[in-house]
Amino acid sequence: MLSKFAKIFSARSSLTKLNDISKGEKVVKSKTLQFYSANRNIGNYLPVLAIHQMLNQELDTWNIHKSPIDWGFVHKNYTQVIVGGAGLLHSVFEKFWVDLEKNCNLPIIIWGIGVCLPDNDQVKGVPKQVVQSVFARAKFANIRDELTRDFYELDPGISITACPTLVHIANNFTVAAKQVSGKKVLHSSHVDLEPTSTTPEIKRIIQEAGFNYSFTENIETQKYPLKKILNMYQDADYVITTRLHGAIIAYAFKRPYIAISFDPKVAAFNKLYGGGVCITSVNELKEALSNDSFKAPGEYEKEIKRVRDFGALVADWI
């Protein structure tokens, strides 16, 4: 199965490539259309690639930053749509959700998404009424945390699992906890949330604690394509992150992490899945690094099984 996806995920590929119908070259290659965010933050791409692998097919995609959607084309060429994964309930995507709720006549599958409520955002999430309406119509719905369920007052029994990212990493890398404690720390930075003054402070604290420091913005570039960034996580002993997907990727590799939260979704992930600790200020980092509590393992095998189980449910229906 993995060879089927080599062209979109390879050390030789400069950037992840998807058949993005919204770019104008409308060459239909699948019967399912997947809505995703094309921002080069790798947290947007990893769940998409994982979903393709769980369905054993490369899906056509539509970048939800580009709206309105050509519903005439969509209804003519596709039998269902997938929304996900990643933080697609961020307020910047309100226009997409309103368009989806009003105009989509196909079965909807919501998969691996969550709300984003950054501390520095005045508008918090997509309007509740729109989200509830779409979820009520969905054939299947899966979200990544209780925060999303509670914020939108969704069905208490809704499927909640870790991000599909876990499956992509398990399918493409060796996943194993390091047997010997090392000194390599990867700082995964959210450039939009992490204050400018905080970045060098995090580096200083890590180095003064005796660790070897490396850095990623989790943004795919020609110099740092997806696989190269993921190799940095695999090589690290520990991860310090201000990004949710920094914690998710660390968890997927069984690397202990310390998450510094500038958005409650980070704490929501840590609460559900463990595998590290969550702090709310850089001032707490020195103490957190000196305390082995962040090294307590999560229940990775149980959680990835639950991700795969939801994938199997959708695959059987499609």
Across the structure, where does each feature detected by a protein language model lie?
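Active-site anion-handling motifs in enzyme catalytic cores
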Residues: 1-318
